[in-house]
Design a protein with these regions (language model features):
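Conserved catalytic core of the tyrosine transesterase superfamily
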Residues: 1-275
């Protein structure tokens, strides 16, 4: 069977265009791939179109809108999740319109499908006292406690996203003045973030203890789990929640949900308040 035009464009979009031309992160590519998996299943199970027979001309506005309604109704997707799925489809059809000009009108009609408005949750931030209590919880007498102490300190000090923290390697760290870490952010954009003196000392001790200050270790994970691998998102959330739970027993004001993004927002608010 001859490949359909839809299969050719989806494959090129996911395996070549996003990574080679747009320099999109592997996590974003995976998220986009998941959207097409859902779309193919919807076309097969709801629309009765087998994946191997799905053609580009069949992906019209009515089908995309039906797919988005299906996500909300059958899969109970939140409006924000629906919008993320739509953003992936918008990226694909923005690519297709330049590859297949005779499909430009079809693509632009899909690009005109609006994002759904929804209330955005307010992200709180911690007082300096609450933050200090959390950062004081790791037990510096244990190896794991020392790792947690520097991890939490960097999470706050740099305002790093969780994935940025996961991706850190010793080669991204500069301990000599001006001390800083190099973070790979969204859109594969690199930025250098300065470090406070206390964080620098914690980080220096961590790297020396784990022999990460040697040149041959510069591509290794800066923070590792018990299997000597990079920490996962759930692993970092677990570490944070463990120490937040202990801090709550000492400070009644810590009665809110604290996530890694809370520390990122806290850093921004502290900088703002300090002028």
């Amino acid at each position: 069977m001859k490949p359909t035009d839809f299969s050719v464009h989806v494959t090129t979009f996911l395996t070549h265009y996003l990574a080679a031309q747009r320099n999109v992160s592997p996590n974003t590519i995976k998220a986009y791939r998941d959207v097409f998996t859902l779309l193919l299943r919807f076309c097969r199970d709801v629309q009765g179109i087998a994946p191997e027979r799905l053609r580009l001309e069949q992906i019209e506005v009515s089908l995309v809108e039906a797919f988005l309604d299906y996500l909300e109704r059958e899969r109970r997707s939140a409006p924000s999740t629906r919008n993320h799925r739509l953003a992936a489809l918008h990226a694909f059809f923005r690519y297709v319109q330049s590859e297949v000009p005779d499909r430009m009108l079809q693509c632009q009609k899909i690009l005109a499908i609006p994002q759904r408005r929804h209330a955005r949750p307010t992200v709180g931030y911690l007082s300096k006292e609450d933050l200090a209590e959390i950062l004081a919880q790791p037990d510096l007498r244990s190896r794991g406690g020392r790792r947690d102490a520097v991890l939490l300190s960097i999470l706050y000090d740099t305002g790093a996203r969780v994935q940025e923290l996961i991706d850190l390697s010793p080669g991204d760290v500069r301990l000599d003045p001006p001390a800083q870490v190099r973070l790979m952010g969204k859109g594969r954009k690199m930025r250098a973030v300065p470090l406070m003196e206390k964080t620098v000392q914690l980080l220096r001790d961590h790297m020396q203890e784990n022999h990460l200050d040697r040149p041959e270790q510069f591509d290794r994970p800066l923070f590792r789990n018990g299997r000597d691998q990079r920490l996962s998102r759930s692993g970092i959330r677990y570490i944070l929640q463990k120490h937040v739970g202990k801090a709550r027993t000492k400070r009644l004001s810590l009665n809110r949900t604290v996530t890694p993004h809370t520390l990122r927002h806290t850093k921004g608010m502290h900088l703002l308040n300090n002028g």
